């Protein structure tokens, strides 16, 4: 039975092979005529059935409309391949998770804790300020000593030699004069005043610039980084020195130097229920020191939700920033720094945070923007950052992916690769160490070179992609004085007692901050993307264009495909036949007669005159042989012939 099936299958494939080898059996012209006569498209039928003039007209119309169809098809296909999206927006109110709230003091360390560590640096900055006097009464004697304060101060070269602070005198632009502020041998006198009383501030700022001298390769290559303000230059220089100093301090030591949660957070209330600093999670920020997160939602923590709008159903806090503990040369702003962010995401307070001013009540109403992007190929977003070729240095905090964490991690990788050390403000990669002036004397010029590099910035931006699902918090902020003049005495007494159980007033208007954070009447706005085009849209529009211009359908396309296949089939068979004939012509011998023998060749060479010309030879007809005429071959006996003798 199996053998019979195999034989039938073999015969079927043999017949199919013969049909393929034979081809459709038509010429190109016959196929085209058949197509025009049998297709469901209207135009081609007119080409073969109308008169000569109408044939030309219908032929032109058919070509024009066919061109329009193919053009529209191209536009539709390109639109589909562009993977466009449509955006939908919905606004409303519902019970939602309350955002995570990160609180920091704008000043990272208590001055009483770090004063011994920064004593020499602060004296250095104070001396530099005396040598750069910005006093309107003194008319800007920039290089004059203050004879009553630090005229005889000698600066320690070990602290400042790595990054000298200078003033550039550009009175003569072709020959600028550079004055080193920290040069102990320089002459500073009132006679060397760089600004006269008749000069205005604009002329002064254009002629004299405070700059940092950045040198590499053992001070053989130096550049000057200019600043428009001496205050800005000193603060930038102070931050660099501070980074180098605290890079040698372990994390536990830096945490002890900062503000404790019980000192920063005085009162807490959420949804009308009391809370305390114990409901906050500690995190260390390189810029603001100890920070505390409410409702972060890490593993094992329950997230809090809010079901009603208004301040009574939100978070209420009273903070004490202890402005008396501020570092004099580090932070020029007195405030609390806060940021609202998504649960389990790292708070980038410096980049995205806002300030809350002391002596005020700051109310923040929140609107949640939920963004949903389409994945590839509709966008280049990433789901969880696993496909990003940048190591997430913030993964140690068990936080989700964000574009800020990616950009900072990318910059830190470039810093380690180029400068051979890591920057103090970013997490430390494995196998690297933070930059210090003693171990890495060239790190500051390298750091500025990377920070100012457009190529590095664009490279990191191209590597880091936005998350497909993200949440942003739109805030409306209002402020009022708090407490009022009539209530401040008893409020400060109560807060001071609750803070340290003392009847002495330790809390005052310069350090107190009150915060109200709550949802608006409409607390969420969902912005989601969906595909603007799909396969159904593409097929529908392709068919619509074809039906409108040509009056055809999918069957017409199949018929056209059939005629194309038949034409290709005929072409292939013709090519194979041509190739076969060409091979046979190559195999055919050049001479039709058999080659001559050796004796014939010798005779033709010795007596060529006897050789006859085959072309002149006329063949002799061979006479035909008549058929035999025997009586024995006859079937019937022949009649006797009478002779004359008998007659």
From Swiss-Prot:
Kinase in keyword set: no
Listed GO MF terms: ligand-gated sodium channel activity
Membrane side Extracellular: residue ranges: 79-552
One Gene Ontology cellular component: cytoplasmic vesicle membrane
Region (Disordered): 586-647
A matching Pfam family: ASC
Residues spanning the membrane: 58-78, 553-573
Subcellular localization(s) per the UniProt record: Apical cell membrane; Cytoplasmic vesicle membrane
Regulation: Originally identified and characterized by its inhibition by the diuretic drug amiloride.
Any one biological process term the GO annotation gives: multicellular organismal-level water homeostasis
Catalytic activity entry: Na(+)(in) = Na(+)(out)
Disulfide bond residue pairs: 104-291, 215-222, 268-275, 381-468, 406-464, 410-460, 419-446, 421-435
Membrane topology note: Multi-pass membrane protein
Keyword entries, A-Z: Cell membrane, Cytoplasmic vesicle, Disulfide bond, Ion channel, Ion transport, Membrane, Sodium, Sodium channel, Sodium transport, Transmembrane, Transmembrane helix, Transport
Cytoplasmic side: 1-57, 574-647
Similarity-based family: Belongs to the amiloride-sensitive sodium channel (TC 1.A.6) family. SCNN1B subfamily.
Record note on quaternary structure: Component of the heterotrimeric epithelial sodium channel (ENaC) composed of an alpha/SCNN1A, a beta/SCNN1B and a gamma/SCNN1G subunit.
Record NCBIfam families: ENaC
Function statement: This is one of the three pore-forming subunits of the heterotrimeric epithelial sodium channel (ENaC), a critical regulator of sodium balance and fluid homeostasis. ENaC operates in epithelial tissues, where it mediates the electrodiffusion of sodium ions from extracellular fluid through the apical membrane of cells, with water following osmotically.
Protein name: Epithelial sodium channel subunit beta
């Amino acid at each position: 039975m199996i053998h019979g099936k195999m034989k039938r299958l073999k015969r079927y494939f043999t017949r199919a092979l013969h049909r393929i080898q034979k081809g459709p059996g038509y010429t190109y012209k016959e196929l085209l005529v058949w197509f025009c006569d049998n297709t469901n498209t209207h135009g081609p039928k007119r080409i073969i059935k109308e008169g000569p003039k109408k044939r030309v007209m219908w032929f032109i119309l058919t070509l024009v409309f066919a061109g329009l169809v193919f053009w529209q098809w191209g536009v539709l296909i390109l639109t589909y391949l562009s993977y466009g999206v449509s955006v939908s927006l919905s606004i409303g109110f519902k019970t939602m998770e309350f955002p995570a709230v990160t609180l920091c003091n704008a000043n990272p360390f208590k001055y009483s804790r770090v004063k011994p560590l920064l004593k020499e640096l602060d004296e250095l900055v104070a001396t530099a300020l005396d040598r750069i006097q910005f006093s309107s009464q003194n008319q800007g004697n920039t290089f004059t000593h203050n004879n009553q304060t630090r005229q005889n101060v000698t600066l320690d070269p070990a602290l400042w030699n790595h990054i000298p602070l200078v003033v550039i005198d550009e009175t003569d632009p072709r020959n600028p004069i550079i004055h080193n502020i920290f040069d102990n041998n320089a002459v500073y006198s009132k006679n060397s005043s760089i600004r006269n009383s008749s000069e205005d501030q604009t002329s002064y700022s254009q002629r004299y610039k405070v700059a940092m001298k950045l040198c590499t390769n053992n001070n053989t290559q130096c550049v000057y980084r200019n600043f428009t303000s001496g205050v800005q230059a000193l603060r930038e220089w102070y931050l660099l020195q501070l980074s180098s100093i605290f890079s040698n301090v372990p994390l536990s030591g830096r945490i002890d130097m900062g503000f404790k949660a019980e000192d920063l957070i005085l009162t807490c209330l959420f949804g009308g229920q009391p809370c305390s600093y114990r409901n906050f999670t500690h995190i260390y920020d390189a810029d603001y020191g100890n920070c505390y997160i409410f409702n972060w939602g890490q593993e094992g923590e329950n997230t809090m939700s809010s079901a009603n709008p208004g301040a009574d159903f939100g978070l209420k806090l009273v903070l004490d920033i202890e402005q008396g503990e501020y570092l004099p040369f580090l932070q020029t702003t007195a405030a609390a720094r806060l940021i609202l962010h998504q649960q389990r995401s790292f708070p980038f307070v410096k980049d995205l945070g806002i300030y809350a001013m002391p002596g005020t009540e700051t109310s923040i109403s929140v609107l949640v923007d939920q963004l949903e992007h389409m994945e590839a190929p509709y966008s280049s977003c990433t789901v969880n950052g696993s496909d990003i070729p940048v190591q997430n240095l913030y993964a140690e905090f068990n936080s989700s992916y964000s574009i800020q964490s990616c950009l900072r991690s990318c910059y830190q990788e470039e810093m380690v690769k180029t400068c051979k050390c890591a920057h103090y403000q970013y997490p430390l990669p494995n196998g690297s160490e933070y930059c210090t002036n003693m171990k890495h004397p060239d790190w500051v010029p390298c750091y500025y070179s990377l920070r100012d590099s457009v190529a590095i910035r664009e490279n990191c931006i191209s590597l880091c992609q936005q998350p497909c699902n993200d949440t942003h918090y739109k805030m409306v902020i209002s402020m009022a004085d708090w407490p009022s003049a009539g209530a401040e005495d008893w409020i400060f007494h109560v807060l001071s007692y609750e803070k340290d159980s003392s009847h002495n007033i330790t809390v005052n208007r310069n350090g107190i901050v009150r915060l109200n954070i709550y949802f608006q009447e409409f607390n969420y706005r969902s912005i989601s993307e969906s595909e603007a085009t799909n396969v159904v849209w593409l097929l529908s529009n392709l068919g619509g264009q074809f039906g409108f211009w040509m009056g055809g359908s999918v069957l017409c396309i199949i018929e056209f495909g059939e005629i194309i296949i038949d034409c290709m089939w005929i072409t292939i068979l013709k090519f194979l036949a041509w190739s076969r004939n060409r091979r046979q012509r190559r195999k055919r011998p050049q001479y039709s007669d058999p080659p001559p023998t050796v004796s014939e060749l010798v005779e033709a060479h010795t007596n060529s005159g006897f050789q006859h010309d085959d072309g002149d030879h006329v063949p002799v007809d061979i006479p035909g042989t008549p058929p035999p005429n025997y009586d024995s071959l006859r079937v019937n006996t022949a009649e006797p012939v009478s002779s004359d003798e008998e007659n």
